[in-house]
Amino acid sequence: MTEVRLGENESIESALKRFKKKIQKAGILSEIKRRERYEKPSARRKRKAEAARKRRR
């Protein structure tokens, strides 16, 4: 669980910014987006192969 403690004299905006940064770094948002819909294993393999092909260019 990602947690951010509000420091003394720290604004909520800056704490929220730190929280968003931690969430992004942990990969939680991308994981949520990936799990929004079911993806068949064959479609997952196809997508990963396509991404690897694009990286090799």
UniProtKB/Swiss-Prot annotation:
Q: Where is this region: Disordered?
A: 37-57
Q: Which GO terms describe its biological process?
A: translation
Record-linked InterPro entries: Ribosomal_bS21, Ribosomal_bS21_CS, Ribosomal_bS21_sf
Sorted keywords for this record are: Ribonucleoprotein, Ribosomal protein
Biased region (Basic residues) positions are 43-57
Q: Which GO terms describe its cellular component?
A: ribonucleoprotein complex; ribosome
Alphabetically, the GO molecular function entries are:
structural constituent of ribosome
Q: Which Pfam families match?
A: Ribosomal_S21
> Which NCBIfam families does the record associate with it?
S21p
Similarity comment: family membership: Belongs to the bacterial ribosomal protein bS21 family.
Q: What is this protein called?
A: Small ribosomal subunit protein bS21B
Question: Source species, please?
Answer: Gloeobacter violaceus (strain ATCC 29082 / PCC 7421)
Q: Which gene encodes it?
A: rpsU2
